Structures are given as structure tokens and as C-alpha cells.
Amino acid sequence: MKKKINRRTFLKVMGAAALAASAGGLSGCGSTGENGEESTIIRVAFNQPETHAEYIALADFGEKFAAATHGRYQVEIYPNAVLGDQGPVTEMIRTGALQLAVVPMSVPESYNSDFAIIAAPYLYDNLEQMETAAREGVFDPLFATTDKFNFEVVTLYTSGARHIYTNKPITKPEDLKGYKIRVQDSDTYIQMINLMGGVGIAMGQSEVYAAVQQHVIEGGENSEVVYNNFKHYEIAPYFSYTNHLVMTDVVVANKDFLDDMDEDTRTTFRKLMKESMEVEFAAWDQNIEDAKAVLDEHGVTFVEADIEAFRERCMPLLQSIANRSDMTREVYDKVQEIKAREA
């Protein structure tokens, strides 16, 4: 069952997040632990603000891991992409310049194309189905394939269902004709928007506001949270519920860093990382509620789209991803089993 975070718990975790935000520079060592030894600093790259559910989960993890290791490890989170965009950050993870980072699923997909199945267009009917799959370990075999690239996927976070926002209502595929829509740098998502009737344009998130203002593109696709955080309602005030993706981000860790831990510490690290997934799922619900309230205040028009019309357009893409390998077919089939249990 999906866990809900109450207001008291949310504020407590936010307090931990604020404490983590005040952590100092990029050195590999910091204050001393309970045994008098210098603490090892785990540096985490993150491209969203401190109020984001993923930040809250990371801060909660950091507090618990520091306590479990008696201060031998401390977590420092660097939000708002201050350490760079997600592509360069991934290379920093691989080389060991960073220990942890939150990246979109398109990053591991660039190393193993089978990752595309986890966030394939219209694979899920709702966010809860993806969360159930994550809890049941459906994606774990895929996560185990990145070791050879010197990073490990240590947990999964939701970044919510994604929808299209533009300067007009989008209710059916025909409404997107000729509309250039920003997507993550992924061939899959470019194809998806093309099939939905528009033109997919890969672009960094920080470029979207100016690109819409200058009529380089007509809009983007994302969750209510990101739409609000980047104030895209100012330049694209129609938010259309196409529900084309249920997106996930992953926390990736440098493999050498993990291998250098003693076995007990590594086990604790992985356990607490998995538990942070539930913190993030619950905090995400709160993020969505808060974002919608702000968007209402700014006069955003929410539009109900014909989801089945868009889904039908994207089915060939979904099936091509599902049939890519035995591993992708297994993930697809297990998600269908979850859907059947809900029916």
C-alpha cells in the first residue's frame, strides 16, 4: 500500500534537509566521528531545489547513515545543479570525483539501452503501478548491469507522471501538430513526442524557459513539481494531462567507493538507500499537492486530455522497447501482472 507522509513527519524530514544543505565544501573529509577519526564525506550531486522530494529523501538517508556509522560518514548534498548538469556529473561518478548523484533514467539507458523499459511511454496506467514494481524488485536485474561502467544503481526515486504544457490546451494528438516540445536527451522520448503528434526536441531543463519565450519551442513535458519549480507556467500556462510517462530517477554511486567500505557498512548503506525510496515516494505526494496549490494561484489552466488516443499512438514504441531483449520483456510482463492484480 502506498505510504502517505503526514505534516509533522514532512516538516521533520525537511529540517534534516535544511541541515544537510548547510554542509560545507567539496573536500573528501570533514568533522570527526564518535571514535575521533575524521569523517568520510559522501558528496551528492542533485539538480533540483532543497524542497524537492528527492532532496528530502537524500537528507533523511544522510542523517540515518551518519548515525548508523557513528559519524564515520557524513553526507553533503549539492542541489540546484551547482556541480554541473547530469551528463558531466555521471562522468564524475564514474571517475570517483563524486560518490553519489541523482540522475534521470536516460543516463543509465545511455550505457544499457534496456533501461528504457523502466520509463517506457504508457507502460503504466498510474504512478502506483511503478512504485509497486520498484518495491517488488522488478528492476533489480537491470540495476545490476552497470557495474562494468564503474557505477552502481543503489535505489530508485519517482519523479512523477509527466504531462505536456504549452501556450494552448492539448487534448488530442492533432493539437500537437507542428509543436516542438522539449524532452530529455533520449531517442525514446524524441520518438514518443513525434508519435504523439508533435516534434521532440532534446534540450537541457535550464534552457526551456528562454526557448519558449523566444519561440524556439512551444512547450515542454514534465510533472507539476518541475513545471512549478522552474516557473514554466509564466510562459506556457496550459498544463494538459497526457500522462505519457511515469518517470523515475536513480541514485548512482561510484563502485570503487562502495567496494572500499567494509561489508557491514556497505550492507547498511544499501539498506538505508532502499528505505529512502519510501521516504521519497511519500514526500513526492506532498510535493505534488504543494505544487498544484501554487499553480492554481498563478492561474494555470489544467486540461484533461484523451489519454487513450495518445496511448494508441505510442503502442508501437512501447512494444519495440518491450521486445528489445529477454530482460525488457521480463520487466514488461511483470508490470502487466501488477496491472492485472489491480483490475
Task: Write out the residue ranges for each language-model feature.
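A gly/proline- and charged-residue-enriched helix-loop-helix capping module
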Residues: 130-134
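Glycine-centered hinge/linker elements that transmit conformational signals in sensory
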Residues: 143-144
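N-terminal secretory/targeting leader peptides
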Residues: 2-5, 9-19, 24, 30-128, ...
